[in-house]
Each structure stands twice: as structure tokens, then as C-alpha cells.
Amino acid sequence: MSTGFFGDITKIKYEGPDSTNPLAFRHYNPDEVVMGKRMEDHLRFAVAYWHTFVWPGTDPFGGNTFERPWFKDSMEAAKLKADVAFEFFQLLGTPYYCFHDADARPEGASFAENTKNLNEIVDYFAQKQADTGVKLLWGTANMFSHRRYMSGAATNPDPDVFAFAAATVKTCLDATQKLGGENYVLWGGREGYETLLNTDLKQELDHMGRFLNMVVEYKHKIGFKGAILIEPKPQEPSKHQYDYDVATVYGFLKTYGLEKEVKVNIEQGHAILAGHTFEHELALANALGIFGSIDMNRNDYQSGWDTDQFPNNVPEMALAYYQVLQAGGFTSGGTNFDSKLRRQSIDPADLLIGHIGGMDCCARGLKAAAKMVEDKALSGPLANRYAGWNSDGAKAMLASGTLESIAARVEGENINPQPVSGQQELLENVVNRYV
């Protein structure tokens, strides 16, 4: 049953690359087979509940620009928001969604009231999922917006805040389990510091490590089969976050014995804030064995802020999905649009148009990436570049060589290697042929 919020807009369909209809897909065809798999199953698109249905269009200099009929702190409004959300998922044809607890439920006066409200809306979500076939990609807890978390959640100097956060994660893991969620995400927006003058760095890291171990212990206790994911970000809102980037997260996981239990959810915009490319973070996560899922968006390259815009750069998407394919594709993860409208885009149709453009961009990137994989456009030159390491001598040097034995061989065989071109320009031109 229609809520009426989207007027007379009907289900978004694939019309092909020649279509000029803004409410149609030009490149995303869910049933198109790419490398032996349906496009929908490769991309596993999800809609972010928070940016799509909760964000009011504020900025540091101005208030709400979006007028939504569910912008009230009541259970009735929460259920209307859910009605509109699931109608949106069906119009768009996205198979998944993601949410924080605070996105979905009214804010209560106590932990018990929050839990009661969450349980009620989770039951409502469960019925919506049964009615529509839409599934939960991942759930998470908002432990950064409420003022109690201004000094962190797991890293807060107040043990009562740590306890409140731990209890909140328990309820959110329970909710994710009940809804059949395929992952559970932790993003530490306040797990960091503003100044070292009032921060015990080691204690906060130790507390965060213990907190995450508790999450993993509870996951196994309740039989949750999904992945636990950390989402790296270098700063914003904290001056310095402890989950700065993939490399930092991996070091943290190794320190606290969690590298086999926890993976990463990598966001395009966060990678850029950390001074990396998206594909760098994806490639590193794959190399370290912790690749899990992605949040798709883009930043404004001039402002330096985490602007969470919809992706529209096909070459960037091609290189990103190339790394996803190199990792074997998604297992429990997917492509969550952690993207929001610009505050001047106030029409309901804008919500659909933003996602349509992002989905088309990702589809084009996936197809280009798949063709590069099939043609060995990059893997062939890469194999040639490292071919010397396939020789018996090179393998023996790594396996049993010492500095003394290697030095003796270099001198005895008069080894004098000459540089070989890295062919970066050629490879960049190759990529451009596919995008």
C-alpha cells in the first residue's frame, strides 16, 4: 500500500543506456549476467536508513531544509518512516537496507525505554521484510550522537558510559540477529580524542579492545552467523579516531587477538579523508584478509569534508570493484549507499534520482572491472612484473637465504640488476579503454 509520499512514481525499471528518463536505470540491470553471476548478486545494494530517511538537511550554518511527515519523536512517526522506507526499497528494487538503532526508534528516557522502543520497531521491520522480501545487510548502534557519548563510548573515561554502550550493542546485536542481518558494524566516531592533554591513550585503546572482544564473545554466544565489521575513519567528529584506516584497524585487531574475528567495512569518503584512494583501502584489506563490505559515496575533493555525496565517477568505481572482484567478491557484505542528498534537493523524487545515479555508476564500474579481469588487462602485466620471483633461486632466497649467503651470491655471480619500466602510463591508458 502506497504512503503517498512519492506521489505517482512507479517502480524504477531498466530502460538501457539510451534512455533519458531520470526515473529509470540506464546501466543497472539486476538480471544481467556478469562473470557468471547476476549483477544484483555482485553488487548487493543497500539503502542507508539514516541518510535517506533521518537526515534533515542541516549544515553548520543552517537548520532543516527537508520537511518529512515522520520528523517527530514518537512511535507512530517511526512506523510511518518505516512505511515510507520499505516503499522506497520496493520502488528502487534494492535487496538490502542498513540502520542504526537511533534511526529507527524514538529516543527514550532510559535504557529500558530505548530497548522497549527498539524491540517494537524491530517487530515492525520484521513484518515489513516478510511482506516485501527486502533483507537487512547490517545493523549497528548509534554511539556518537547523544551527548552521553561526547567523550566516547567504549573509550569513555566514565565506566557507566562504557556500560551503557555495551548494553546498547547487546540489544542491537539481538535486533540484527532477529532481522536476519548478515553483518554487524561498529563505527567509532567518538572513539578517539580532541586533545592528548586529557587523554590516556593506552587505557582507551585497551578498553576499546576489551569492548570489541565482548562483542565477539556475545556474537558466538547467541549464534550470530554474520560478520563483525569495523568501519575505519581518520577524523570527524573526533580530531583523531583510533580506527584511522585499514592498516591502523588491522594493527589494533592483531594487538587484541581479533584479526580472525573482525573484518572491515570500507567507505569511499573515509578512505579519501585518510589520504588514500578507495582502491588502496580495498586492496590492503584483501591482502590482510579482513575485507568485508563497502559504504559507497564520494567526497567533495576541494572542501576536505566528509560530504557523503552519491558516487558519479565511473573510473573510480571501476578500480574499486576491480579490487572487490580480486577479493573474490562479497560474501556477507555488499554496497551500502552511505550517501545523502544535498540540502537544496528537497523533493521526494530527489531521493530516488540520487540512488538511481549511484546504482548506474556502480553498475558501469562493475562491468568495466569485470572486463579487465576477464581480459587480464592488469593481472597479465602484473604477473610479468613479478615473474622473476617464480624462479627456484628467488624462492630459495626467501625460504632460507641470509644476509651473508645473499651477499656472497651477489658478489660471486657479479649480480648487477638494471631497472625495468613500471609502465604506469601504459596501464593508465589501458584502464581508460575500459571506462
From Swiss-Prot:
Any one GO biological process: D-xylose metabolic process
Primary localization class, coarse: cytoplasm
Cofactor(s) required for function per UniProt: Mg(2+)
Disulfide bonds: none
Record's GO cellular component terms: cytoplasm
GO MF, one example: magnesium ion binding
Gene3D superfamilies, alphabetized: Divalent-metal-dependent TIM barrel enzymes
Keyword terms: Carbohydrate metabolism, Cytoplasm, Isomerase, Magnesium, Metal-binding, Xylose metabolism
Residues engaged in binding Mg(2+): D306, D308
Localization per Swiss-Prot or TrEMBL: Cytoplasm
Self-association state and partner proteins as the record states: Homotetramer.
Textual note on the cofactor: Binds 2 magnesium ions per subunit.
Enzyme Commission designation: 5.3.1.5
The protein's name: Xylose isomerase
Enzyme class at the top of the EC tree: isomerase
